[in-house]
From Swiss-Prot:
Its main location: cytoplasm. This is Xylose isomerase. One of its GO terms (molecular function) is magnesium ion binding. It catalyses: alpha-D-xylose = alpha-D-xylulofuranose. The lineage of its organism: Bacteria, Pseudomonadati, Pseudomonadota, Betaproteobacteria, Burkholderiales. HAMAP family: Xylose_isom_A. Binds 2 magnesium ions per subunit. It comes from Paraburkholderia phymatum (strain DSM 17167 / CIP 108236 / LMG 21445 / STM815) (Burkholderia phymatum).
Length: 441
């Protein structure tokens, strides 16, 4: 008997259902702004938290009894894990999944065995995708768990570690391409420092820039059509990470001429750790032209670490979706659940409940954001607020028609006395709340 065999397939039954194994709001074929809900959300289930994490923390060992965690032949366990993973994906009805290379294949005892194991499991995943119709949203490489990466991967002081990391990324990128992945994610889990006393910041930054450039070069060499994405995070496991937030990543990409080659995968919990709102990071990514995809989860404001809980805030996600919708929606990206059940949630039902609730929250937030878009009083207010910059005078300033001196001279000659006007924050917050709560059916 499989781990999820006793659980039913999850279907939409509407908001009045009492069935805990049904969607109340996620109706995948429902049209929202003329597009199917499933196509807006592009939901993905992650391999690592769902099938790899054993329920351990720094104070105790794993609490989960998953059949694929049992001792045995490593490749056989990887096959069993894939069987259970695609069973869950199918029962949830989610169209996408995501993985790290070492989530799906054992590393083995050498670099050659790593390559062989990963290729063998890529064949397995290809067959699973063909059998189920489930697609790969993105793949990535785990460059942070093995002790060799204690001092980083691309930023490591040992070039052999850099080379091992390059081998993993090459294989993970090519596997992602073979599996039809829409994106490839680069997360520098240990690309940072714990102390400046042993760190050469300039050298490590240059190493990281060269590594990213090599990935871009290989993407073009192989013809991979997906997007390359960096996932910002300010700290953890290192004290300070070089991909701190969206703005920092943009500065890094610009320094190495990669701003047109790599975009960002934004995680809600990482925004929290960086002292930003999820809304801020998404809006900033669009403003800088590097928005790519989203890791949907939540953190805990009372904890200073990455709790990776399932998202449950319609209010937070409505504003996130508002930015995504008003900028045209996802292209290659989607909503990946980088989220895990709690350590005490040890039953297979808990995994399913976590995803059902999170998917329903996404669905509600999407519809509330669509309501904001349809009656876009926020955009109308912003247009009015910045109207002066659309005047001949404003456009002339931005076009370089004034020097600092000539602009000051003009201001004195016209004897200007500009006055402050209301930002109307309270009214705008009311508009958002009306969209969230008044449109509930």
């Amino acid at each position: 008997m499989s781990y999820f065999e006793h659980l039913p397939a999850v279907r939409y039954e509407g908001p009045q259902t009492d069935n805990p194994f049904a969607y109340r709001h996620y109706d995948k074929d429902k049209l929202v702004l003329g597009k199917r809900m499933e196509d807006h959300l592009r939901v993905a289930v992650c391999y690592w938290h769902t099938f790899v994490w054993p329920g351990a923390d720094m104070f105790g060992p794993g609490t989960f009894e998953r059949p694929w965690h049992h001792a045995g032949d490593a490749l056989e366990m990887a096959h069993a894990k894939a069987d259970h993973a695609f069973e869950l994906f199918s029962k949830l009805g989610t169209p996408f999944y995501t993985f790290h290379d070492l989530d799906v294949a054992p590393e083995g005892d050498s670099i050659k065995s790593y390559v062989n194991n990963f290729k063998a499991m890529t064949d397995v995943l290809a067959r699973k995708q063909e059998q189920t119709g489930i697609k790969l949203l993105w793949g990535t490489a785990n460059l942070f768990s093995h002790p060799r990466y204690a001092a980083g991967a691309a930023t490591n002081p040992n070039p052999d570690v850099f080379a091992f990391a390059a081998t993993q990324v090459l294989n993970a990128l090519e596997a992602t391409q073979r599996l039809g992945g829409a994106n490839y994610v680069l997360w520098g889990g240990r690309e940072g420092y714990e102390t400046l006393l042993n760190t050469d910041l300039k050298r490590e930054r240059e190493q990281l820039g060269r590594f990213m450039s090599m990935v871009v070069e290989h993407k073009h060499k192989t013809g991979f059509k997906g997007a390359l994405l960096i996932e910002p995070k300010p700290q953890e496991p290192t004290k300070h990470q070089y991909d701190y937030d969206v703005a920092t990543v943009h500065g890094f990409l610009t320094q190495f001429g990669l701003q047109d080659e790599i975009r960002v995968n934004i995680e809600a919990n990482h925004a929290t750790l960086a002292g930003h709102s999820f809304h801020h990071e998404i809006a900033n990514a669009f403003a800088l032209g590097i928005f790519g995809s989203v890791d949907a989860n939540r953190g805990d404001a009372q904890n200073g670490w990455d709790t990776d809980q399932f998202p449950n805030s319609v209010e937070e996600l409505t504003l996130a979706f508002y930015e995504i919708l008003r900028n045209g929606g996802f292209t290659t990206g989607g909503m990946n659940f980088d989220a895990k059940v709690r350590r005490q949630s040890i039953d297979p039902e808990d995994i399913v409940h976590g995803h059902i609730g999170a998917i329903d929250v996404l669905a509600v937030a999407l519809e509330r954001a669509a309501h904001l878009i349809e009656h876009d009083r926020l955009a109308a207010f912003k247009q009015q607020r910045y109207a002066g910059w659309d005047s001949d005078f404003g456009r002339k300033i931005l076009a370089g028609g004034y020097s600092l001196e000539s602009l000051a001279s003009d201001a004195v000659q016209r004897n200007i006395a500009p006055r402050h006007v209301s930002g109307q924050q309270e009214r705008l917050e009311n508009i958002v709340n009306q969209a969230i709560f008044s449109s509930a059916k």
